[in-house]
Amino acid sequence: MRKILCSLLLFNLCSVFSQSEITTDELYDHISFLTSTVNKGRYPGSSTNKKLVKYISKDFKNSGLEKFDQSYRQEFVAELRVSKYVDKKPEVKTWNVIGLLKGNDPKLQNEYIVLGAHYDHLGHGGPSSKSDQLDTVHPGADDNASGTAALLEIAERLSSIQSQLKRSIIFVAFGAEEQGLLGSKHFVENSPVPLAQLKLMINMDMVGRLNEQKQIYMGGAGTFPEGQKLMAELGKEAGLNPVVHAGSVGGSDHVSFYKKNISVLGMHTGGHKQYHTPEDTIDLINFNGEKMVCDYIFQTIFTLASSAHRLKFIAQD
């Protein structure tokens, strides 16, 4: 298996060498828009929600992603966490944003890798805030404008080499993650393709604060064959120090997929004291580090989508 993985790495690195790269400028532009005060902390059901969905949809279209059912939008109703003391919680309409890159292998094109990130945040705080400044916009630069920006940039780069893909790739910007993984729960209950055809879900939640040790953390690497080896080797190739957990799945949108017996990887660059506060701002994002993380995740998806590497769910204790 090690020889197979090495061959895959060499082939894929040569294949993508001449492609245009993800840039820190593009990542900055996305995060700058998402964290702008006019977006009011990206709260589900807010007046800016449609604008965010339109922005992501437009970027998917510009990258050449296909629609499901003639739309990038998947509408659902989110029950908001306003207070633990409120019995009947308010409900609002919001959306997941979904795009597709079709693979080219007659058989493997019916197997899908899902790349996802939630685009919502806390608005002005609420019960999930760690701050007492509940009248202040929580911009959520790392959580999770960083993951949303990564999603858009990786989608664009993969689209440019679509002809080399065997498996298909679904890209999802989830809504209402902060309200209890509601967007991803809705997706797996209303998947545009049969769940049995979803072979791996990679989730990016807080990928913008790479530390000096260049540690990228992930859970779920043991949920598919040779996952730990593959992620460790690809991480080193990317110049990162991957902290690979086999059985610790984590607690973000990928958990909704794991509960449906779908292999997962949950990617993040670690926690920090600005988490869920108004201080999670764009000036603290490590853009060079986020680019490295994006390149790593891009290479992971390309390696698995352009080969016949077996993807089978392995439950973890």
Question: Model-flagged regions — what are they?
Answer:
Residues 1-22:
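Bacterial Sec-dependent N-terminal signal peptides
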Residues 16-67, 110, 317:
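N-terminal hydrophobic or amphipathic helices/low-complexity stretches enriched
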Residues 20, 37-47, 83-88, 133-144, ...:
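Second-shell loop/turn segments in exported
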Residues 38-41, 60, 66-67, 82, ...:
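Solvent-exposed loop/turn segments at secondary-structure junctions
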Residues 42-102:
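A non-catalytic alpha/beta surface segment that caps or lines the substrate-entry region
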Residues 108, 115-116, 126-179, 297:
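Alpha-helical metal-binding/catalytic segments enriched in His/Glu/Asp
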Residues 160, 273-317:
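His/Asp/Glu-rich mid-to-C-terminal helical/loop segments that flank catalytic regions of hydrolases
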Residues 174-272, 312:
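Metal-dependent peptidase/peptidase-like ectodomains
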